[in-house]
Amino acid sequence: MELDKKHIKSIRTLFGKMKTKDEFLALLNYAKVILYGEKAIPFSISQLNYHYTPKANRKRYIQFAIKKKSGAERIISAPNNGLKEIQKCLNLIFQIIHTPNPAAMGFVNGKSIVDNAKVHVGNHYVYNIDLKDFFPSIDQARVWGRLRNAPFNLNESQKRSELANIIASLCCHEMEVERLDDSGSFVKVVKSVLPQGAPTSPTMSNIICERLDIRLAGVAKRFGLKYSRYADDITFSSMHNVYQKESDFLKEVERII
């Protein structure tokens, strides 16, 4: 959707000034009016409290599995209608506050998989990396930490830091995921992570991956390559081959990822 400058300025101003839960609620309701019009029924403080507190709302998500093209299963966690509406408003706020890295092609307004492919047109060599379990690899602690840094800056006071906790909780869901243990083996653990199925997860994943994009774009520049990322699909391309096993390029990429 197209946003006018007034809406963008107002969202940024309200976000920058908010210090209390009531002010955050007012911001969500302003975003709701932008999305649904003046007749949109505003969220109440009790609704906000209910949806950001997992122990109060134990049915925040419904989980089900779908088949991937590979035949493996992908777990979808669909938020209930109330939480989903809040997440849609929150997602609009994220998109206004944060400017995606130029290398990010997925989940970005005005960009598509075609734009991702155009970056690499004409190059002779293409190297792809698929990030495993993309959304669930991002846990609530990382979301909270990212919200405390620019451009969100929810670390400027104790009250704003508490808002970072609320927003991170609205974005994440506790579920069983795989993590590497100290021996390098994958084990099942329960973590609060970005769920596949929440409206906020795509945008937040780009926000979290901003540092990754900066570092990988830097590697690409040093080796004379093109770099882009479409969601969990990382692509490098070039006119020369630097992708051999044990190459300096691959070693550097592995250190980052």
Language model: regions and residue ranges:
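Active-site-proximal segment of RNA-dependent polymerases
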Residues: L83-P136
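N-terminal low-complexity, intrinsically disordered segments
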Residues: A31-L48, I93-F94, H98-N101, R146-K159
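Conserved polymerase palm-domain catalytic core
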Residues: V121-A231, T235-I257
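Short amphipathic beta-strand starts and helix->beta connectors
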Residues: K59-I62, S112-I113, V219-F223
